[in-house]
Amino acid sequence: MKKILLTCLLASASFQVSSHTSEVLSGYWAYQEFLEKFPQQGVLTRELSEVVRNAPVPLKSHQSKPIRISVVFPGQQISDYWVRNLSAFEKRMDKLQISYQINQVFTRPNADVKQQSVSLMEALKSKSDYLIFTLDTTRHRKFIEHVLDSSETKLILQNITTPVQAWDKRQPFLYVGFDHAEGSIALADKFKQLYPQGANYSVLYFSEGYVSDARGDTFIHQMNHSDRFALKSSFYTKATKASGYESAKNSLERYPDVDFIYACSTDVALGAIDALKELGRTNIKINGWGGGSAELDAIAVGDLDLTVMRMNDDTGIAMAEAIKWDIEGRTVPTVFSGDFEVVTKEDSPEHIELLKKRAFRYSDQP
């Protein structure tokens, strides 16, 4: 396997998921809603899920040449999700004995869009067989529509599991990730257990876009089912630790009467923890989102109260298996979501270690 690594810094500064998700995310099919509306998709997704959980079976089809894969990921952040995801993908591809070349570009979330667009256009000009990207902003969507309309490159959209309704006749090759609504609802259910008498809370969003809508608005919608919970404030961030710190300070200075803060990402949560310590407000509970290494370390020392932990490597494995199916001429599902587990600081180290072995079964390998 030939590997081309371009590490670039492009910066300018299971749970029951209710049917309301498509109301929160206008213009998208909710994950379960899509699988129910298109039953054959449900069958394919379940088949892929079983393959992901099982040992790899090497490719038997002949390859005349290596496939070419371009990856544009927002990997430059404290959360190790993206780096681990790509590591799991490559290791599973190797186990499947697929011959491939990969070109990687890591950016920051909320990065300079012009620079990001240059990297994406270069990926298309290289005539990659597969392009792995994400969808968070309107500009991302315009580029994706260009790819769907005018390129033979097959598009894998990472970190999104809600198919775009307007693309009904020309969907990407695969949507893959951990369903933001499912994870957010799991956290909402846990907060309701922690505060049976109700509570006041604040929300710290990611940067403006799909992730904030899917994680933040879904959580608020779920908490609104009970009149015992009151949203006191909500702030968008720049999706960084520094902006999480500043937003948490601003929120608490203006609305100090809160019992917990709901954070929409790792970096935002870790910044907010620093603010809570500085203000002497460590009585306020705060969650993480994703359960990567940084969050689990924070839980171990008691800084973070809870998180929803992605079985991280599921999605990297799913991408590799979907490509294998494609090479073999099999029908690939449109969407795949990996598994979650809620983790709290009260959980035993032994229990968390078992979850880590499952979540990082490839990405922790040397």
Swiss-Prot record:
This protein's record includes keyword Chloroplast: no
GO cellular component entries: periplasmic space
InterPro entries assigned to the protein according to its UniProt record, in alphabetical order: Peripla_BP_I, SBP_2_dom
GO molecular function: carbohydrate binding
Domain of life: Bacteria
Signal peptide range in chain numbering: 1-13
Localization per Swiss-Prot or TrEMBL: Periplasm
SUPFAM superfamilies noted in UniProt: Periplasmic binding protein-like I (SSF53822)
Main location: periplasm
Record keywords, A-Z: Periplasm, Signal
Function: Binds to an autoinducer molecule. This complex then interacts with the LuxQ sensor protein.
Family to which this protein belongs: Belongs to the bacterial solute-binding protein 2 family.
The protein's name in its UniProt record: Autoinducer 2-binding periplasmic protein LuxP
Organism of origin: Vibrio vulnificus (strain YJ016)
Name of encoding gene: luxP
